[in-house]
Amino acid sequence: MNVFRLSGDLSHLAAIIILLLKIWKSRSCAGISGKSQLLFALVFTTRYLDLLTSFISLYNTSMKVIYIGCAYATVYLIYMKFKATYDGNHDTFRVEFLVVPVGGLSVLVNHDFSPLEILWTFSIYLESVAILPQLFMISKTGEAETITTHYLFFLGLYRALYLFNWIWRYSFEGFFDLIAIVAGVVQTILYCDFFYLYVTKVLKGKKLSLPA
């Protein structure tokens, strides 16, 4: 494992922990897109079905279990425990416009036409756009809480670091996964505007708000 993958995994884990702590400590999921969290839960479920068929390492298995567990814990907090605080009026992105095309693309473009491989490919494509409901929600409300922006920053950082991981693996291992790289580039691009606002506003102590 190289430093970029490890840093990416830690950034991803930090994002998940920040979100869970934000919801639990505030006893509220206001400003959080439940639809994005449902998509992430679907991403991890379809990606890590290999937990049932293979073992790579204790680290690999542990991280997969943590991601799946935290994803469903987040969904539970939003839709069950703190349902009264969920802002469904602003969380209105039509997720079928993501899931259906991604499902079709994963059947057409994959590494191997087998159930597990198609589901893995589906998860890669879906993860690249799963944050869109959250970004759409922020665009509708016009602002985001600081802690929510920290969550989004670490989530975007995780994906950016994974791009460097792919570059490192190609340079030193000769490994090249076009599907993962293209999806990662798309996902990173979606965060570009947010990164700019995060650096120019949030890191200077200002609240992230979008221009009217």
From Swiss-Prot:
Identify the stretch(es) annotated as Interaction with the K-D-E-L motif on target proteins.
Answer: 47-48, 159-169
Instruction: Write out the topological domains of type Lumenal.
Output: 1-4, 53-58, 111-116, 169-178
Q: Which GO terms describe its molecular function?
A: KDEL sequence binding
Topology term for the membrane: Multi-pass membrane protein
Q: Where are the membrane-spanning stretches? A: 5-24, 33-52, 59-79, 93-110, 117-135, 150-168, 179-199
Q: Has keyword Transmembrane helix?
A: yes
Query: Which residues make up the annotated site Interaction with the K-D-E-L motif on target proteins?
Result: R5, S54, E117
Leader sequence segment: none
Q: Single Gene Ontology BP term?
A: protein retention in ER lumen
**ATP-binding as a keyword?**
no
- Ranges of the Cytoplasmic topological domain: 25-32, 80-92, 136-149, 200-212
Which stretches of sequence are listed as region Important for recycling of cargo proteins with the sequence motif K-D-E-L from the Golgi to the endoplasmic reticulum? 204-207
Give a GO cellular-component term: COPI-coated vesicle membrane
At which residues is there a site annotated Important for recycling of cargo proteins with the sequence motif K-D-E-L from the Golgi to the endoplasmic reticulum? D193
> Keyword annotations for this protein?
Cytoplasmic vesicle, Endoplasmic reticulum, ER-Golgi transport, Golgi apparatus, Membrane, Protein transport, Receptor, Transmembrane, Transmembrane helix, Transport
Q: Where in the cell is it found?
A: Endoplasmic reticulum membrane; Golgi apparatus membrane; Cytoplasmic vesicle, COPI-coated vesicle membrane
The record's family statement is: Belongs to the ERD2 family.
According to its record, what is known about the domains? Binds the C-terminal sequence motif K-D-E-L in a hydrophilic cavity between the transmembrane domains. This triggers a conformation change that exposes a Lys-rich patch on the cytosolic surface of the protein. This patch mediates recycling from the Golgi to the endoplasmic reticulum, probably via COPI vesicles.
Q: What does this protein do?
A: Receptor for the C-terminal sequence motif K-D-E-L that is present on endoplasmic reticulum resident proteins and that mediates their recycling from the Golgi back to the endoplasmic reticulum. Binding is pH dependent, and is optimal at pH 5-5.4.
Q: What is this protein called?
A: ER lumen protein-retaining receptor 2
Organism (species) = Xenopus tropicalis
